[in-house]
Every structure is written in structure tokens, then in C-alpha cells.
Regions:
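Charged helix-capping and loop-helix junction motifs
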Residues: 127-132, 183-187, 213-217
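C-terminal domain-boundary segment and adjacent tail
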Residues: 40, 44-51, 80, 93-94, ...
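Short phosphate-binding/catalytic loops that engage adenosine nucleotides
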Residues: 82, 108, 166, 227-228
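Secretory targeting and sorting signals
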Residues: 1-32
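Active-site beta->alpha N-cap acidic-glycine motif
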Residues: 37-123, 127, 133-134
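CE4/NodB-like, metal-dependent polysaccharide N-deacetylase domain
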Residues: 74, 78-83, 88, 106-109, ...
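Short histidine/acidic/glycine/proline-rich micro-motifs that form metal-
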Residues: 90-93, 117-119, 152, 174-177, ...
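His/Asp/Glu-enriched short active-site or ligand-binding loop at hydrolase and phosphoryl-transfer sites
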Residues: 144, 152, 157-193, 228-235
Length: 235
């Protein structure tokens, strides 16, 4: 009797066990996956902060044109897309007129630096005027700006220039590149003294200007990195 009852209960117990097993959740398949980092979108990229505007500065070159160095300086200016004022000597223009034309063609300005670089303060009014006119005869027109050689001027010279309808332009930063102190010395002197509105004096003629060429190639990107814009004076 007991054996018969056990045989009847066994299928029922097995069915109940199977139902209980199916009712237990499968944690391996239903647990949430661990969080993953969201994809980076364009709007989440790190923004590059622009350099703050520090001012406008101006490049000027004296004593050219030079057959050797002026074209090399022009190449550096074109490389960076900047322009300068070249205060030229009339006698040099007569030797290398095509170089002066190239400077103007590529957007640079020419200023009057006299015929052959005398100290104008030692000359009479007549000879000051002669020096300026002789340079302009070689150039073919009257530029708007005059730079007296050595920066030597006084009220008399300034009046002569103004009466001609021209502006006297000196400089505010002089790295003394003409003395060939070393490429990095030229660069560092400019960077130390430069301010908003600075007129930087460099030379493309009058001697070996290889250091000036090399310094210019280093100087322009460093001025920009400090927030300076390189402008062009109206000459």
C-alpha cells in the first residue's frame, strides 16, 4: 500500500520541483551591464583657447635694398604673410631697382632713407632737401614716410620733412642687429622690449645681415604666440 502511494506521488513531486526551478530568476542574464564611458562628440572636445590680443607692432628695415639679403627677408615675410616698411637708400635703388619693385609688388612699403645715409643734422637745408629729392628721383615717386639716418633729427629736420607733406618715422625697439650680436640675441632683445605700437628697427643692407634673416624667421611666430599682430604702417 505504501509503495503504491509513493509511486503515485513521485511524478507529482517531480512536476512541482520543475515548476519551482523555472520560477527562480536567471541572475546571469537579467543583471544590468556595468556602465561604460559615453562616446566623445565634437561638442565635448577640449576647446583651444586663443591667445589674447596684445597689440599691433610694425617691422621696418633700413639701408637696403641689398642684392643678397633683401630677397631673403622678403621670402621670410611672404612665408608668414606679413609686410614691412623698407627705408631704402637712393643709391642702392639705382643698383637693384628690380628688388625694390619686388618689395612693392608683394605689398610692402618703401620709405625715404636719403640718397647715401648722411647725418642730416650736419647738412644745410639745401643739402637735406637734395638728399631726399635724390632718393625719390631714384624711386620714381615721393613716399609718405622719411627716416633720417642714425635717427639723427631735430626740429629743423622735422620741419623740412613735414613741409614736404611727409611723416618722420623713427623706431621704438632697436635690437642692434647691425652689430651682429647673434641671432637669438636679436630675437630676445625684441621680445623683451616690444609693446603695443612698437616700431621694430632691423636692417636688410649695410653689411652681413644673415643673422637678421635668421632672427626674423624666429621672431615672427614668437610675436604672434604672444598675441601681437604684425601690421603695416601707412607709408
Amino acid at each position: 500500500m505504501n509503495t503504491k502511494r509513493l509511486r503515485l506521488l513521485t511524478p507529482l513531486l517531480l512536476a512541482l520541483a520543475l515548476i519551482a526551478a523555472l520560477a527562480v530568476p536567471n541572475t546571469a542574464s537579467t543583471s544590468p551591464a556595468p556602465p561604460t564611458a559615453p562616446a566623445v562628440t565634437d561638442s565635448q572636445t577640449v576647446a583651444v583657447v586663443p591667445v589674447a590680443y596684445a597689440g599691433t607692432v610694425y617691422l621696418t628695415f633700413d639701408d637696403g635694398p641689398s642684392y643678397t639679403y633683401t630677397p631673403r627677408i622678403l621670402a621670410v615675410l611672404r612665408k608668414y604673410g606679413v609686410h614691412a616698411v623698407f627705408f631704402e637708400l637712393g643709391q642702392n635703388i639705382t643698383w637693384y631697382p628690380s628688388i625694390t619693385r619686388s618689395l612693392r609688388y608683394y605689398g610692402n612699403k618703401i620709405g625715404n632713407h636719403t640718397w647715401n645715409h648722411p647725418d642730416l643734422t650736419t647738412l644745410s637745408n639745401y643739402w637735406v632737401t637734395w638728399q631726399l629729392n635724390k632718393m625719390e628721383s631714384a624711386l620714381g615717386y615721393r613716399p609718405r614716410c622719411v627716416r633720417p639716418p642714425y635717427g639723427a633729427t631735430n626740429s629743423r629736420i622735422a620741419t623740412i620733412i613735414a613741409n614736404r607733406g611727409q611723416r618722420q618715422i623713427l623706431w621704438t625697439v632697436d635690437p642692434r642687429d647691425w652689430s651682429r650680436p647673434g641671432t637669438w640675441t636679436i630675437v630676445n632683445r625684441v621680445l623683451y622690449y616690444v609693446r603695443d605700437g612698437s616700431r621694430i628697427l632691423l636692417h636688410d643692407g649695410g653689411g652681413d645681415r644673415s643673422q637678421t634673416v635668421a632672427a626674423l624667421d624666429l621672431l615672427i611666430p614668437r610675436l604672434r604666440a604672444r598675441g601681437f599682430v604684425i601690421g603695416l604702417m601707412a607709408c
